[in-house]
Amino acid sequence: MLRVDAISTFYGETQVLFGPSLSVGSGEIVALLGANGAGKTTLLRSILGLTPPRSGVISFDGAAITSKATHEIARMGIGWVPDDRRVFPSLSVARNLQLGFKKTRFRNWTLNEMFGIFSPLEHLMARDCENLSGGEMQMVAISRALLGSPGLVLFDEPSQGLAPKIVQDVMRTIRRLKNEGIAALVVEQNALAALDVADRVYVMGRGRIAYEGPAADLRSDMALRTKLIGV
């Protein structure tokens, strides 16, 4: 579904990504781990066209997207849940969700299904997002991404700043995507939580892929896990 082949990405004249390659299959959950500054968020930004790579190829659903604009990539079926949620604070929850609605060739979600996943949402619809807690904002951000009918969702630090109960709900939602045939690429500092839901894992270091393998292998091998990600 998603292929990233040997991309090089720069901020100005500073190179940040040095040829990482990865893939995410249809309905597959893939974790992308690594220390702060390893290049994980830049890789997501490259996929989304926000920081386009200078070389290499990115393809989605069989089509090259390396040179496409971000809005075109979204219309093709890639959703994004950024680390800062990026809800519109002065707009209501209902309006924020309405802005996410799109139809693609992938599964189309309904608002009632979002209420089934995040039950508090139904009672927050009239509230402005600036009055929400961090956990409530994350519910809005994830729901908005799903209402865009993606075949793939990119999650950037989905558990950041959330209470443990909300983290469980978020990870349960990511796991559910697999059952719905939706793929996910999950950047996450909470490595154990990510490994619990992922099928495969990549570990980045200094803009390169340092490790690739089944998530269960890294989860069960404490020595390797400590060496690669320090947990």
Predicted region positions:
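Conserved ABC ATPase signature
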Residues: D128-L132, E136
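ABC ATPase C-loop
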Residues: A145-L146
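The feature captures the beta-strand-to-loop junction immediately N-terminal to the Walker
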Residues: L33-A35
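Helix-to-loop junction immediately C-terminal to a conserved catalytic motif
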Residues: L48
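Conserved ABC transporter NBD signature motif
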Residues: G56-I65, M76, W109-T110
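Conserved structural motif at the start of ABC-family nucleotide-binding domains
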Residues: L2, L17-G19
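Catalytic Walker B motif of ABC-type/P-loop ATPase nucleotide-binding domains
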Residues: V153-E157
